[in-house]
Design a protein with these regions (language model features):
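Active-site region of glycoside hydrolase catalytic domains
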Residues: 1-265
Length: 265
């Protein structure tokens, strides 16, 4: 259905729209709805989460395939490009990690970051992540004959990189929960962290550099740009002066510190 929607949209607006993106932050729905259970339907079900994530991935790949076909037929603007935008979060752990802590980092990175990077840059999913999910955790991903050919079509022209916060993890207390579903990690509280208390998000400007360099190293042929980065603050009227100007020096500092790290990449 989504692939058909994309095809119709491109046929209607292909002569006007030059830059297309299949999804913005496709990781959010499977994580928030089914992994963490904080959005409707408020379920904590890793199997459901990974299969929703897998189906969104296929939808992305089919959308890219439709774009390529229409472009080859001359139905899109000259120089038209297609990409994906995702919120990436570089994972970190303790200063002296155990092998179990490093495994939590690997799978957190694999499911949240590398899953999407491998598809958009290389046209496949990370095999080590699939092996862990299906062989070690015994969670079935509903893969069908022909899916690999669909995934191979998922490579994009460029990537949008949203960055707000890192992910800090350590080994979970147990490998499986009371329902027999895998526990990927548990949060690690870095003693030196600086927080945006209004969002509950850590402010870590170096993370935008670390992940940008990861993209350059692992996907050297994939152009990317910073598509989102900023600081959300609730109730900013309390920082408003007598002239009606919000004195948001905290936001200026946030943007400045991130730009300094971007300049080093």
């Amino acid at each position: 259905a989504y692939a058909n929607f994309v095809k119709i949209a491109m046929e209607e607006f292909g002569d006007k729209v030059k830059y297309w993106f299949t999804f913005n932050e496709p990781i959010v729905e499977p994580e928030q709805q089914f992994l963490h259970g904080v959005w409707y339907p408020y379920q904590k079900d890793f199997k459901q989460s990974i299969n929703v994530q897998y189906n969104i991935t296929l939808a992305h790949c089919l959308a890219v395939a439709n774009f390529r076909k229409l472009k080859a037929e001359g139905k899109l603007c000259e120089g038209a490009k297609i990409g994906m935008i995702n919120c990436f979060a570089p994972p970190y752990t303790k200063e002296n990690p155990t092998p179990e802590d490093l495994e939590a980092v690997r799978m957190t990175d694999g499911l949240h970051n590398r899953w999407w990077l491998d598809v958009v840059a290389h046209g496949h999913l990370p095999q080590d992540v699939l092996d862990t999910v299906e062989n070690d955790w015994k969670v079935e991903i509903n893969r069908r004959p022909g899916d690999e050919a669909i995934l191979a079509q998922g490579k994009v022209d460029w990537l949008g990189f949203n960055y707000y916060q890192p992910t800090r993890v350590q080994a979970p207390d147990s490998k499986f929960d009371e329902n027999g579903l895998p526990c990927i990690s548990k949060p690690y509280i870095w003693p030196e962290r600086k927080m945006n208390v209004y969002r509950g998000w850590e402010i870590y400007p170096k993370g935008i550099y670390d992940f940008g360099m990861k993209i350059k190293k692992e996907c050297p042929d994939l152009p990317f740009f910073i598509s989102e980065n900023g600081m959300g603050v609730e109730g900013e009227e309390k920082y408003m002066d007598e002239n009606g100007t919000v004195q948001d020096d905290y936001r200026i500092e946030f943007v400045r510190d991130h730009l300094e790290w971007i300049a080093k990449a």
